[in-house]
Each structure stands twice: as structure tokens, then as C-alpha cells.
Amino acid sequence: KGVAKENHYLLKMALYSELKKDLEVLPIYEILVQHYPKKRYWTNLSGLYGQKDRQMDQMGALEAAYDDRLLDKQREFTALSQLLFMFENPRKAAEVIEDGLNQGIVKREEKTLKAAAQYWHAARELEKAKPYYKQAASKSKEGELYVFLGQVHFSLDEFDQAEEAITEGIKKGKLKDEAAAYMLLGQINFENQKWESAIESFRKC
């Protein structure tokens, strides 16, 4: 009886698809996820919400699938973490992307490591952000991520590591704001009582 009921909804959806009425299937998916919470129903429902610019519902559907341990693709983990971050939940965004990285579902590449770093940073978990900034920076062709890493070290009063990271960022180049990087380096040198280096850095601002 249960299978027939599910098949009834699937048949109805097939008919709507034939008639090119794709958005008409949305309420059917809403019923299916309640009674037959399979991964494809959640992800399809999330996609339909996205098409209708219902981002909060789009996130809710993906989050429900994640909480049931149904997600198994990188794009699903990154989409959910981006939506969570957009709706001001950086901690869960960081936990989701980190979970994907730890499971090997999400590849350890610059953009995913940078996302993990920025989500933890936004959640004010600087110790957790540090290793991700470091890994992302080492994969980047630009120095920007080393500057972010330096800012984190500076916030934690780790001045030697901050100096090393900022210097590496300036050396790698292609910074959006090189003057700001030199300003930060000057502040770090000042904290380290390296007066001449501090003055030299401030002059380069």
C-alpha cells in the first residue's frame, strides 16, 4: 500500500513533467519528503525552492537532508554551507563544509578551504580558521589568504606568526590592498618592538 501511494505521486509528477509544468510538482515533493524522506526528494525540492527564489526553504530542505546524513556530493555540501552563511549561521556553515572535507566528499582545494576558513572566522573561531587559511593560502597563486592568516594570528597576539604570514602574502603579491597589508605589518613590527622595520612598513603604505 505504501509503495503504491508513493508511486501514485511519482506518476502524477511524471504527468506534470510531460506537460512542462515543472513547478507544479513542488507541492507533491513537499508531501513526499514528509512520508518518504529520500535524498532525491529533498534535493529536488530544494532546487525547486531555489527556482522560486525561496532561499530560506531551499536551505531548510538541504539542511534536513544533511541532518539525516543523506548528502553525498560536494556541490550539495557547498550549496548548503553557502546558504547557511547567507542566513547568518556561519558556525553551522563551517561545520557542514568541515564535515564534507573530513569525509572526503568535499575536495581540499583553494575555494573550499577558503570557505571553511572564512566561515570559522565569521563564527569567531579563530583557532579553527587558522589551519584552513594556511592550507588555502599554500594553494593560492595570490597572497591575499596569507594576509587573512596574518590578521588571525595578529588577533590572537601571535605576532611572530603574523609577521611571517603577512610577509609571505606581500611576497606572493596580487593583493587587493597592498597598503593595508603594509599597515598591518607595521603594527605587527611595532608590537614586536622592531622599530626600524615598523617605520619602513608604514612608509610603504
What kind of region is each of these model predictions?
Residues 1-204:
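Alpha-solenoid helical repeat scaffolds
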